[in-house]
Amino acid sequence: MKTYTFGTLMDGSEVNAYTLESDHISVNILNYGGILQKFLVNGTDIVCGYDSPVDYQNSAGYQGAIIGRYANRIRQGSFSLDDGTVYQLAKNENSTTHLHGGTSGFDQKLWKAAPFSDNGCEGLSLFYISPDGEEGYPGTVCAQVTYKLSGKQFSIR
């Protein structure tokens, strides 16, 4: 596995890229948002990725990123639990809707990276702890995403 500095965010934070490789496949994963930045099959890139972290920050899309805490829209940016507690979330779509985790969702976080290799399989696990109250959500969430490449098989879990 190759690891290199992909670039810096607008606040100066460093973003790293991790390259998983097999005979015909090469995959670049960023620790920023868990973004699948490049996916080469026999030398042809099959994803729409950018060449710098700032391009991802300036994009209105979520290209290749981990989405969360919630993927999709929450109308009026609020929800309630069975006990009647109402939670107001960040509204980041037309000032009325909570979209894909809010103004600073999982796609915009620097994740802790743990590369690994095992019996011809290269992999990368990313970890992020979303604290209670982040983007208005209750409770702490410990998130993990694992990417694996073995021969022609690539998986994300």
PLM feature spans:
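Surface-exposed acidic/polar loop and edge beta-strand patches at domain peripheries
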Residues: 1-157
